[in-house]
């Protein structure tokens, strides 16, 4: 009766462990060593952790670990970058479609960006002239330009209508 009561009490309170033959090596506060937990592994599971001395991979000397990762661009990206920097190079890049504008040997946005820069410079010049106080001359010139553009648009419209009929 007492032995049955002791068994039921020991199962109901797992905190009060008494050393037995199966767990003589482990006491309540200690944990099993790393080799017991990992089994019979020769090397640690992580490649980022340094290797242990008992793995036997490189003898008795400690191994120097390098954690630097070097990323390299794919070859066609590097060639494309070099071709964009060197304007005399004629390298055909197969990843860019020819329908994107121009030939595959030329950058597609060269003419567009040049026009954009020239337009921007002209607008900045006009703003600078207006800011400096010569607004009367610039305003008269801009009004004349607007009148000429309207006349040109009307002439083009008449030509289109004449060709249509």
UniProtKB/Swiss-Prot annotation:
Organs and tissues of expression: Predominantly expressed in white adipose tissue (at protein level) and brown adipose tissue. Also detected in heart.
Organism expressing this protein natively: Mus musculus (Mouse)
Ranges of biased composition (kind: Basic and acidic residues): 34-43
Name of this chain's protein: Nutritionally-regulated adipose and cardiac-enriched protein
Keywords attached to this entry: Cell membrane, Membrane, Transmembrane, Transmembrane helix
One Pfam family matching this protein: DUF4658
Membrane-spanning ranges: 112-132
UniProt topology in membrane: Single-pass membrane protein
InterPro entries per UniProt: DUF4658
Compartments where located: Cell membrane
Ranges for region Disordered: 1-47
GO cellular component: plasma membrane
Reported induction: Highly up-regulated during 3T3-L1 cell differentiation into adipocytes. In vivo, down-regulated by fasting in both white and brown adipose tissues. Reduced in white adipose tissue in obese animals.
């Amino acid at each position: 009766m007492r032995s049955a009561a002791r068994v039921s009490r020991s199962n109901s309170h797992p905190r009060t462990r008494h050393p037995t033959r199966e767990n003589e090596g482990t006491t309540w506060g200690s944990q099993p060593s790393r080799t017991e937990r990992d089994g019979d592994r020769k090397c640690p599971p992580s490649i980022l952790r340094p290797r242990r001395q008992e793995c036997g991979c490189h003898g008795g000397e400690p191994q120097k670990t390098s954690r630097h990762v070097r990323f390299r661009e794919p070859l066609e990206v590097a060639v494309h970058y070099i071709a964009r920097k060197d304007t005399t190079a004629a390298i055909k890049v197969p990843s860019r479609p020819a329908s994107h504008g121009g030939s595959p040997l030329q950058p597609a946005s060269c003419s567009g960006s040049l026009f954009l820069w020239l337009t921007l410079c002209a607008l900045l010049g006009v703003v600078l002239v207006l800011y400096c106080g010569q607004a009367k001359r610039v305003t008269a010139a801009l009004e004349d330009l607007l009148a000429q553009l309207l006349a040109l648009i009307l002439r083009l419209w008449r030509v289109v209508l004449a060709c249509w009929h």
